[in-house]
Amino acid sequence: MREEPTAGTADATLNKLLQAADLSGYESDLRRKLKLRNAADLQYVEEVDLLSVGMSRPEQKRLRKEYTKMFPSGIFGKVKKAFKRAESLDRKTSNSVANQDDNDHHVIPIEKITLCKELGQGEFGSVWQAGWKNSAGSDVIQVAVKCVGSDKLLATSSSFLQEAAIMTRMRHEHVVRLYGVVLDTKKIMLVSELATCGSLLECLHKPALRDSFPVHVLCDYAEQIAMGMSYLELQRLIHRDLAARNVLVFSPKLVKISDFGLSRSLGIGEDYYRSEFTPNLKLPIAWCAPECINFLKFTSKSDVWAYGVTIWEMFSYGEMPWKGRSGAQILELVDRKKELLTRPKACPEDIYDMLKETWTHQVQDRPTFSDIVAKFPERRAQSVRAVVDCKDSAADHLHFKKDDLIVVISRSPAQYPDGYYWFGSLRNGKLGLFRPTDTVAHLGSEPPCSNGTIENGFSEKEKGGKKNKKAEKESERERKKLLISEPVGDVRHTCHVGIDGTAFGLLQLDKKAMCPTSSSPSTSRGSQASPAPSHTSSSTTSSVHLRETVARNGVPIKETMSLRDVGPLSRDALNLRDTVSPPVARAPSQPPSYSQPRPPPRSVSSVSSGNQHSVQVHDQFSSLDRSRGSLTPTAPPLTASAANSLKDPLTGISLSIPSNNLISYMDDQEDDHRWTRSPGAISQSTTLTALSSSRKDPIPAPRGPVAAVYARGKDIPTPASKSDIALCEKIEDLNRDLTNYSIGTICDYSEDRPLLDSMNRTISSSTTHQPPPQSSEARIRFMTEQEVRKINEKSAREHRKTEDLLREERQKEQKPGEIEEPQQPAESLYSTRTPQQEGWSSAAQEAYKLLVECGTNLKQASVSPPPMSPTSSRLSTLDRSSISPAPPRPVTPPLSVRNETISMRKSQQEEMEHVTVEENSPKRVHIIETKLIDGPARGMSPIQDRHIPAFTTPMSNGSFRKAPAPTPVSPAPAGSTDQKPPPCRPPKTRQFPLVIDERNLAYDNLNGFGAGARVAPPVPPKPKVRTIFSFADDQKKQKEVAN
């Protein structure tokens, strides 16, 4: 029955609590009305009870505050802490007593040991559970007693006691403690700790406990065994018989090594190993190293071999190593053939790699237990967490739910060597395949727990339901802390690296490129100015700086920028700038995707003597031969070629700086903005010589990564730098759109040079041409009226100039004597000017009528006249005859107008029709068609001339129709019959079909519609004999000229 606390103790605790809360006046009411005896009873008091005694809410708040101070974890937590303190005091007392007993008495009297029941039989004897009554008190401790027969003890009692004294001083959490020995005439008893769960081999063989030993628990056991053996190794003790049967299980998470040192103490030696070859004994030869079998040489390295076999035995769940083989066969396989045990199904790949190292045939090549413990966290099986539920129908697949942990055993199982499925184990011990895409990495494996407590079983079902729920909630919170959360806020999931090492996404994306507007780098090439370390950095060698103020681009305060480690450049050769780079430009720390050939060095305009900054880039970049690490995880490593490209001096880049974009610098203390535009007066020290041409060379892409610092403090000076100003202005120039036209961009052209200049142009230091100011903000603007007027005037001047040149070319082509063609006599017939005749004779009229009849018969034939000679008139005179049956009228030959006028006969009253063809430029060609419509006529082929544009004129029957063949015979005087045209090449003809609209037959080109019906067409004139004779005379002259 629980003891009640005394009144004095109760009054003291309650009175102390009320005095601390300044509520002593409520003590009598709390004791009398609420029946409180001590301060601990306040945990059962509710707010309504305190209100009933008149305590206000502020007073209740003060009472709760003082109560929390007195009982931090509640009354039950206080009681547990008290019990723990008492238990620790008892443990210390017992330890001190035990130590005293161990130091003074290693031998335990036999009357203090009471054997209870036999636990099993071993190689050296039987094992019993017994009670040991300690001399320090009356309590009885449950211990394990191993009884060894005197016939098996070959050594003397004194040496055995010396070894027992050494073993009793061993203190380790994973080594079974030996309390002492009991000496008797018949047998010797070894008193040690009691493991109620038995040996590890027995637990692995029990099917009911198979689920209690999943893969992750076995990994913990392997590490604990290695830690215990490492302790024995440091104590220079050799186990000689390490196996799963000698590993005791104290709890589901704790194992300890037992029976260490007994092989040497018991003196088994050669007789023991000879007995292994007999068929009646269990042979531990499968756990022995080759040197132990061949030379009976036991060392810590032989224990390492046995440790590997023990771990293999554990992951195979108690299977016998080299099962079915004799000792001689095992020695043949291990010593001569050097074969190894195959990997168990539940053994992770990394653990099996460690086992193969322990089975190295050469003793010196095996690792020590200290090495195994140091490297074991890296070899521990990795766990993944399921993100979806999986219930595959396949029998060899795992069935798991979301948030279940899976231990990865193999990433390339034999069924799926491509890694599409992995092989793993659930927490309940089930093995099977699963898809890695259904899982995520689980950060932080559960550390091995060794609380040193002894439990009676592995089941935890005895706990209450409420306690289990609370534990589940706490474990859920712990699991959530170990997982990577989803992207929150503006964070973007740009890339992912899987548990198997595969990655996808934007791995090369610089995080500075994801900012609203990134900062452009600017490296100070000057050797005179070295920036001071930023006071925002924790170390002077750190390349990560914090931004002091809000930048102009909207970067928040104290934003950390990751930078590359560029050695000396991070402290001496880098200045911090706040220039604005193009929004769509590539991040400076990201290397270009192509390599550009190295351009020849070019000269840079010299600056004024007031501010001379030497450009010594080659010396500063000479230390970049080494490979460098990067603080930015997404940035690629620096290659050797990229490091060599950084050595090249940047003096080869020629930049032009407009006068309105020059930059002056102000003190950091006066203005937070480091750079200030000054469109007016420009400082002489910051003025650079610009290009003489308004067109600027494009900046070639960098050939390697660019190291840059993106933030700086106020205490870093900002000297004027040529490269900074040039880079800033060139970026602004590139920002301007090509649609921002001006007079210089439209009218500045030439046919004898390309539109884009080469990049090798040198800058003339004598010329200081400054382009007109242009605003960087206005990308597209309207042209002013003055600019439009200037453009029109210049265009008109260019057109007039072109017309003059074209007219001169035509005049040169029409000069006589340059080009001679045999068709000139035939063409001269149409251009020969005949004098005007006053009348027609009767013979001429008869001949003309005959010619008209011949033309009527040949009206269907459409033969083009021979081409005209370039020496002839530009536009020939076309004789048109009237089609009307009215009386004939005399023909008035028109005057030849040079190049521009076409003369035609229209009526008997000697009217002339002048058609003027105006050609202003080669771009505009006016084709004027003059039509005299006639019903039977169907058109006429145009004159083919390569110097004049073709035009079509429908004519009457027989007019302007000359066949290229010999001229038809007409009635003429005798003198004209034997005159034949000279032999010549037939002219090139091209037929152009002419379509006449019958609905417009009444249309006249001069008088309009209906005029043709009212005015009768004229009578065809009578040809004159002199005209025919002129044709023969011209032919005769041409022959004479040709001869």
From Swiss-Prot:
Polar residues bias spans:
610-624, 825-842
The active site annotation covers 241 (proton acceptor)
What cofactor does its activity depend on? Answer: Mg(2+)
Keywords, A to Z, come to: ATP-binding, Coiled coil, Kinase, Magnesium, Metal-binding, Nucleotide-binding, Serine/threonine-protein kinase, SH3 domain, Transferase, Tyrosine-protein kinase
Q: Which organism is it from?
A: Caenorhabditis elegans
Question: Known InterPro entries for this protein?
Answer: ACK/TNK-like_SAM, CRIB_dom, Kinase-like_dom_sf, Non-receptor_tyrosine_kinases, Prot_kinase_dom, Protein_kinase_ATP_BS, Ser-Thr/Tyr_kinase_cat_dom, SH3-like_dom_sf
Q: Please, one GO biological process term?
A: negative regulation of vulval development
Entry coiled-coil feature ranges: 785-812
Q: CDD domains annotated for this entry?
A: PTKc_Ack_like, SH3
Stretches assigned to the CRIB domain: 484-498
Family, per the entry? Answer: Belongs to the protein kinase superfamily. Tyr protein kinase family.
Q: Which gene encodes it?
A: ark-1
The residue ranges flagged as biased composition, category Low complexity, are 516-543, 630-644, 870-884
Q: Pfam families, alphabetically?
A: PK_Tyr_Ser-Thr, SAM_TNK, SH3_2
Q: Where is the composition biased (Basic and acidic residues)?
A: 458-481, 790-818
Task: Name the reaction it catalyses.
Answer: L-tyrosyl-[protein] + ATP = O-phospho-L-tyrosyl-[protein] + ADP + H(+); L-seryl-[protein] + ATP = O-phospho-L-seryl-[protein] + ADP + H(+); L-threonyl-[protein] + ATP = O-phospho-L-threonyl-[protein] + ADP + H(+)
Name of the molecule in the record: Ack-related non-receptor tyrosine kinase
Q: Where does ATP bind?
A: 119-127, 146
The molecular function terms of the Gene Ontology recorded here are:
ATP binding; metal ion binding; non-membrane spanning protein tyrosine kinase activity; protein serine kinase activity; protein serine/threonine kinase activity; protein tyrosine kinase activity
Extract the Gene3D superfamilies matched here.
Answer: SH3 Domains (2.30.30.40), Transferase(Phosphotransferase) domain 1 (1.10.510.10)
- Explain the consequences of disrupting this gene: RNAi-mediated knockdown in a gap-1 mutant background causes a hyperinduction of the vulva in 60 percent of animals. In addition, suppresses the slow germline development of clk-1 mutants.
Which intervals hold domain Protein kinase? Answer: 113-379
